[in-house]
Amino acid sequence: YFSMPKLVPSGSLLGMDTNRIKEWSNVVTAFTEGKVNGKTIGDQGTAPKKVLYLKGPNSTEFSKEPTRYATLIPTVYNADTLGIRPDLIKRPINTWAELLNPEFKGKACILNIPSIGIMDAAMVVEALGEYTYPDKGNMTKEEIDLTMKIFTEAKKSGQFRAFWRDFNESVNLMASGEVVRQSMWAPAITAVRSQGIPCVY
C-alpha cells in the first residue's frame, strides 16, 4: 500500500473492477472500511482504506468513499508486536518501552527493514513518553532524527543483540534465547511456540 501514492497519480495502474472479483465482499473490513468488528482503527501512514479505491477505472485519484474500482487485492497482512520469552523474563511486559529497558541489555532485537522498523521504533518512543507523533507513517525529518537519535544511543550502549532481517532470523533469535524481547511478527511467535518454546506478545 505504501507505493500507491506514487503509482496511482502517475497513471501506471488501472483500477480493478471489484464486481468481477467473486470474493470481494469477503475482503477484511480493516482494508475496505478501516474498521474491525465495527470499530474504526487508526489510519496513520498509508492506511489501506485511504488508497484502496479509485474514482474510476482509469483514475489517477483515490476515492475517499468505496467505489467499484480497487487498486489492490489484500492477500497477505500481518501484525507487528513485541514478542517476549516469559520463561526468561519472568514478569509481565505490557509496553513497547520495555524494548529499551536496560534490565535486558544485550537481549533486545528490532526489525532491520527501515520502512517497517521505523514504525516499531516510533511505538517505543511514544511508549517511553519521549514524543507523540501526529502520524507515525508520515514523519517529518525532525521526527525521524529524534527517533534515530534515541535508537542510536540505545545501540551504542549495547541494548541490542541483533537487528533481524527476515522471518527465520527473528524466530531463531527468540527460540535460542539470545533475545528475550523483540519487535516480531505474529506468525513468527507462532513458529517459536511450535518448537515447544514459550513465546507471547
Regions found by a protein language model. Name each.
Residues 2-169:
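Extracytoplasmic ligand-binding site segments that recognize negatively charged/polar headgroups
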